[in-house]
UniProtKB/Swiss-Prot annotation:
GO MF annotation list: RNA binding
Organism listed in the record: Xylella fastidiosa (strain Temecula1 / ATCC 700964)
GO annotations of cellular component type: cytosol
Classification via Pfam families: SmpB
Keywords: Cytoplasm, RNA-binding
Lineage: Bacteria, Pseudomonadati, Pseudomonadota, Gammaproteobacteria, Lysobacterales
HAMAP family in the record: SmpB (MF_00023)
Its biological purpose: Required for rescue of stalled ribosomes mediated by trans-translation. Binds to transfer-messenger RNA (tmRNA), required for stable association of tmRNA with ribosomes. tmRNA and SmpB together mimic tRNA shape, replacing the anticodon stem-loop with SmpB. tmRNA is encoded by the ssrA gene; the 2 termini fold to resemble tRNA(Ala) and it encodes a 'tag peptide', a short internal open reading frame. During trans-translation Ala-aminoacylated tmRNA acts like a tRNA, entering the A-site of stalled ribosomes, displacing the stalled mRNA.
Basic and acidic residues bias spans: 144-158
Family: Belongs to the SmpB family.
Name of the protein: SsrA-binding protein
Amino acid sequence: MNNKHPKNKAKSTTTPKTIALNKRARHEYHLIERHEAGLELQGWEVKAIRAGRANLGDGYAYVRDGEIFLIGAQITPLIQASTHVVANDRRTRKLLLHRHQIDTLIGRVQREGFTLVPTAMYWSKNRVKMEIALAKGKQAHDKRHAEKEREWQRDKQRIMRAHNRNA
């Protein structure tokens, strides 16, 4: 009896697979609120993303004509990308959100002076999604304070590990 679908088979989890992270965003901004957005991509961009050629380091989102666009994020084209299409690796890409989300984000950016920063790009159900965050820029003293806090947390962990080993 060859059973193709065993009952005790572990169910697959639908955890999103991370493509790219913007680690610099946490260092340079206070991240207030996060939102998931789709991306309007061309075919060569999806192939390049599958090959792991995305970089969010210099990216940010801006508002134009009631829509939100991503600028500065780099998707490096593959060598075998189509020859009849000019591949611009830093082109402006439209972010896909619901109208009420767009209105909320636009209001907070214009009234309260927030910035929209991409923090992560990942796969969700075979679609590329981007996590964007409402953010406020950090001052130099904020960055120093955050670095001191991280160092203290590392030292604390080191001390606890040494103490637990000796106990």
